[in-house]
Amino acid sequence: MARHGFAGTSTEAIVRAAGITRGALYYQFVDKQDLFRCVCEALVKRLAARLWTETMASIEREEDELRVGFLKLLDYCADPDVRQILLVDGPAVLGMEEWRRLQEPSTMGLLRHALGHLVEAGRMPADQVEPMAHLLFGAMTQASIALGEAIDPEHSRRVYRESLERLLDGLEGR
């Protein structure tokens, strides 16, 4: 689906690539949109696990988790498959509410964890973790939508990265 997008991928192409029958496809999934929802869920979970692993492996101080994680997430948005599936087709096929709902559990958990380190370091009051997690989730959601729609994704990713650095500088008191 990533190469041709949701609309450009027929169920015939899906069953052929998977080596299954159309009956087997519809036994597991109500329709192509249901299959796509499952693809999105799996991709979000895979990216969240990858983000956690790569972020934890690359930070020296726990309070750097938020910055490093956010910047890695922006880099993931540049991947053509992620861009097509999650950023272009995801909102269009599933609708914004469902698309957001798929991402929220893993993203909010990662944000709360990272913000907790800022609390531990004395750089944020504990009662601001939840509102800040929601604000940052909204900012990242909007940034990812913009990156998905970008005519020049590489330029847009660079500009959003610089803007995110400014936002995090302010949050971290730099």
Language model feature labels by segment:
Residues A2-D34, C38:
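Helix-turn-helix
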Residues R3-A7, P80, A121-G122:
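Short coil/turn segments at alpha/beta junctions that flank glycine-rich nucleotide-binding fingerprints
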Residues A13, D34, C38, V68, ...:
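Alpha-helical elements of Rossmann-like donor-binding domains used by nucleotide-donor carbohydrate transfer enzymes
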Residues C38, W52-D81, M132-L136:
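Hydrophobic alpha-helical connector segments
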Residues K45-W52, D64, V68, M96-A121, ...:
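Amphipathic alpha-helical packing segments from all-alpha helical-bundle domains
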Residues L51, T55, I59, L94, ...:
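Short amphipathic alpha-helical interaction patches enriched in hydrophobic/aromatic residues
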Residues V68, L74-H113, I145, E149:
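Short secondary-structure transition hinges
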Residues D75-D79, M108, R112-H113, H117, ...:
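Amphipathic C-terminal alpha-helical segment
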